[in-house]
Amino acid sequence: MVESKRSALLWEVLHEAYTRLGLGEAVGGDRAFEQMVLARLIEPSSKAQVPRVLGDLGLESVSVRTLFRSLARAQERGYREAICQALFEHVTASGGLALCLYDVTTLYFEAEREDDLRKVGYSKERRVDPQVIVGLLVDRHGFPLQVGCWEGNKAETATIVPIVEAFQSAHGIEELVIVADAGMLSAANLAALDDARLRFIVGARTTRAPGDLEAHFHWEGDAFTDGQVIDTITPRRGSRSERDKSRKAEPVWDPHTHPGSWRAIWVYSKKRAARDNQTLTAQANRARAVIAGEKRPKGTRFVTVHAGDATLDEASIARARSLVGLKGYVTNIPARLMDAGEVVSSYHELWHVEQSFRMSKHDLRARPVFHHTRDAIEAHLTVVMAALAVARYLQDATGISIARIVRELRSLQEVTINLNGHHLAAAPRLTDAANDILTALSTPPPAH
């Protein structure tokens, strides 16, 4: 007679990753916290559902009350700081940390009222629910290092300096390259990062191209070749350039000879130009439809209204067409330390942090819709960050997603049979996929 079934192998793999990262030690062996973290990887749900999630696997859970007491401890005892230290030690165990990626997202709440933290602000999902801004700092492979939380109506540009300074202070870091998208590009941010002796690489807004490339347009017109790189300078503030457009050669940026500028790198791609042209054509067609009264004029580009009459802004369309295919980058790293190609490739590592956000918002469903106080929200994000670290560790080690790891191992159950009062445990027969996962993790298969 079958007495019980347990997905012991799945839990062992998750627990081993959690332990290898030093998370158990970081939280003082808090079993309830570990159960909340690992349960998120199996099935994203509320804390109150953790006993059910573990029960479905044939595993024993602590009580719901114990889980919520653990959340309170997470804030009282500084679990996040200890976890961040463990993750930093994991990342730097095999070498130094030279580059970090930063991005932000919004997490919304299905709530009727705002409070001090949960504010209605700009939402990437175009929602009007109260929300918080979450910033995530990861290494160049997308492994999480630090998470921050701000009021929902705070400008994204105001989040990067506090989280980077906190990270520097916590780990005694003096030299670091920070990579962020154009949303972080404010003059104050770049000056603050530079003052902190940090290097940065950020995306440039295309609207800067006419000024940065004024000499190129003067000498070459708007002709570019596929893969062309223009390494030049851009004003730190305003639009007044230190560039002498009467000289054809681009200046080599140096902080001493160009104190009012940063280094700017512009790259032209035929593939990007085709994509940009397609987008512009669609926008111009929409503008024409709005002018003709066929579509509603909500936020339409290339439409100008004068004395109540809507007209097509042909000059803006022509200006936009002259910039298709261009992508810009701003940095304070001199060419002697990093060539243009390396700056560009470093920036394009940003997809790792975007992937981490997708994991935390979709695979892990990080939205803390059930939490109502700042401490509870912060504790929830600590759980999410720990879960994301375990997920990234397993994904990097095996080359497959956490969702697939859970799917492959969940059905492999250890069965306990009661044979005339004698209890016999039977290990599951491993699939090829399960064997591959265990081999990649150097985890021995269960004994038969």
Q: Where in this protein do the model-derived segments appear?
A:
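Anion-binding and metal-coordination hotspots
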Residues: M1-S4, A8-H448
